[in-house]
Amino acid sequence: MSELVLGPLLRYVGEREATIWVETDCACEVEILAARTPTFEVDGHHYALVRVEGLEPGTSTPYEVHVDGECHWPPAHSPHPRSVIRTSRRGSPYRVIFGSCRVARPHEPPYNLARDQDPRAKEVDALYTYALRMTTRPPEEWPDLLLWLGDQVYADDVSNGTERFIASRRSTDVPPGPGVANFEEYTRLYLDSWSDPLIRWILSTVSSAMIFDDHDIMDDWNTSEAWVAKIRREPWWHERIVGGFMSYWVYQHLGNLSPRELDDDPVYRRIAAGEDAGPMVRELAERSDRDVGAMRWSFHRDLGPARLVVMDSRAGRVLDEQRRRMVDENEWDYIESHSRGDFDHLLLATSVPFLLAPGMHHLEQWNERVCAGAWGGLAARVAEWIRQAIDLEHWAAFDRSFRELAELERSVASGEHGGPPATVITLSGDVHHAYVYEVAFRRDGRASENGKERAAVYQAVCSPMRNALSSTERRVMMFGQSKPFTAAARAMARAAGARDPEIRWRSVDGHGPWFNNQLATLELDGRSAQMRIERPTPGDAGPPQLEQLAERRLA
């Protein structure tokens, strides 16, 4: 009898349609709400993306998953509420939770202890704790979207089960050691990361959107041209990167697409017609590694009163030192064109933050200039070592793209492409702490081009879901935000020929940063926007609880 291995994951949800992703143990037919889809096969693994259509806007519809006619979801005697599809309605209120960086570990000691208590500790899982609270609250208080902003899995810090699986297949005494080596090992990592019953339930009933960052492939992936040249000399790298792209396409990317976009996707269209998926997905992965323009991973969604544009800020980097870009020109055209329109809020999501603490921004500016030869060849080699050692690879380290994104936000916020939205908010993860910056533009005030008040502009960062920093790492981070460090870094950047940015930013109300496992919630209702950040705390002889760290009205 066919079995459900992983899922269901509720992925795309619009006003009248939804997609639901599953993995099964063999070729079969999957049925959800009378929609039937045959599985496709990739290297011995079987998947289906079921398209459910004909739903009504603004409704909640319970569903079951049938595999070859047998009900496999919900599990028998499940203690959790029923899985539902909650469709959106244009202009209606919308609740987004977002975060990044979640390692898969058991929810018990020593893994849920404080980082400084045990070297194996990852503290309490924020997503697990959020899901636990959801089960006790009415559906109208549930989020509409879970936005994953990178490092959904850690290919170089694998789960206990994945490490045992790898050790049963090959020696971990030689590279890549206990890290993932190929597609087969990635499938086990995703299984361990998403199969906890409570995590499985929240993923079945809250729509999700995802974009990868470095740890989905490897720490520091695509940091620089020199990093790529060095890693490609490793004999194990080809299968690692191909397996990473293959698994990302199957487990994450497909569900980001709307039904219409699936119809336009040449690979998925051939798979849906019955062609063998494995060779096609592998060929796509190999092209994606060698050609940044081979695949557009960025995507967009309309969320109630908002437009969400999720930008790939990892795979599509142009790394030539003389023409570095965070995304290539074609992908940037897509981002620009989908950031314009008639909506109350523009949400621009990027795994790595657009705005860092000012001192770190100046340091990355300095580093990019010196790596490109501003101080000569020897200094360039030293700067490259520094870049890789302390991860100087955010938008500030791609100055051309930084200025393009700043100009895009300014033009949208000031109403140059129509009426200005109420907010323009950049959502990010990656840096293992949380903060909210408010942004001001040097060239204009609060008035927009058409006389209306300009949109409020913010950078909101929330990280990690589960991979908190140690106390020593936190002190280093705080030093990078100090006034002496900022002054020194700015002087270095200017000495290397970098220009000050055209925007200014500061912490909202002077609060933050917060160093915890945490999740952020963004609530949109018409032209109002409210944000809060919560962290999980161990329960007193009971389950973990969420504690509010900050709440702020953004518009």
Region spans (language model):
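Metal-dependent phosphoester/phosphodiester hydrolase catalytic core
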Residues: M1-A555
